């Protein structure tokens, strides 16, 4: 890939500027709308940050394709050929609205369907997790992360989305029972971070492309398993039930769930 270091520098700059937009919004009233249901929210800040990212990408890389959470229905992406940016301006919008914390901003960069760079920015903690196969490393700001210990299920905390617990989807309650405990954060980016750093042993949820792309790049760079458990093919442009875990935990989990 051409000048990936230039892309890396640009994306980091965009994320820092987006953080300023988001933090400045805390002093203003939010316009909050619902999308697919009462818990699926979008705010004027989500839209503003996505517009900012799109403008920066189009200025720097006019040939690039863009898939953004808030514009995906207007400008759907049909293939991953060429330079592709996948955007989630505010991941965990409910947390952003209700808590003013526990949310992230995420960008993933692909080239000809190959992962290059992933970015998950914990806005409040000012912690940027970034890296990918072009660096063969993942960092939190300037600190390089170690590959997480390949622990078994019983040794770690699991993270699941609410429906998997409430409805026992795929039999995930058995996974909870076999683990050291359950945690739920309501933000895919932060839950990916917990697995990247070894704080939790797995994360499973129904994820859309913008929820998944950046975390998948970072997790696979750290030798973690990222797999769709409801479909055979991993198409980055479709929603799917995703499990990210250590290799040993993944083996334990697949023995317990029903697919």
Label the model's feature ranges.
Residues 1-90:
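N-terminal subdomain of lithium-sensitive/metallo-dependent phosphomonoesterases centered on the IMPase/IPPase/PAP
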Residues 47, 70, 89-92, 123, ...:
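Generic detector of well-ordered alpha-helical packing
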Residues 123-154:
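ATP-dependent small-molecule kinase catalytic core of the GHMP/sugar-kinase superfamily
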